[in-house]
Amino acid sequence: TIDSLFHSSNYVIANLECPVTKIRERVFKRFIFRGEPEWLPTLRRHGITHLNLANNHSIDQGRRGLLDTQEQIKKAGMVPIGAGKNMEEAAEPVLISTSPRHVWAVSSLRLPLENFLYLPQKPCVSQESIDSLIMRVKRLRATDKNCYILLILHWGWEHHFRATPQQREDAHKLIDAGADA
């Protein structure tokens, strides 16, 4: 079962496609999601250790909702990835494991956010350009030569099941820069 697979793993990273907060902020977009904080311990019980927030719905309850979501994830015993008090914090690689090698997660949203004014000094999800991601991967590889670098990219288009030529090209550039997966 998926449950036994997750429990047999030291680390399980999942994409959390909604804010998990009691905060309700008015946002103007087509689909607005929100989950209850009480649901998070269930994810932890089923083996989830890290939750990616660099996606197009983590900001669905505004900036306060995003920050609260990070706190709720921590309270439930998991680690949030890909969001922060500002872009610098949101884009910071997260150390997943130290043994036998360092494993780093680098997360970024690669889609435009609907009706959201992106302000890099305010709470946000990581939303870096490919060139910025390439530089981040190269810097990480240069400082930690024997590590594994996992990229968590939220990209693609709804109901399309194949990568676009541009996504394939970008993926190859990131691999060439030093990303492992």
PLM regions and their residue ranges:
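Acidic, metal/ion-coordinating pockets
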Residues: T1-A181
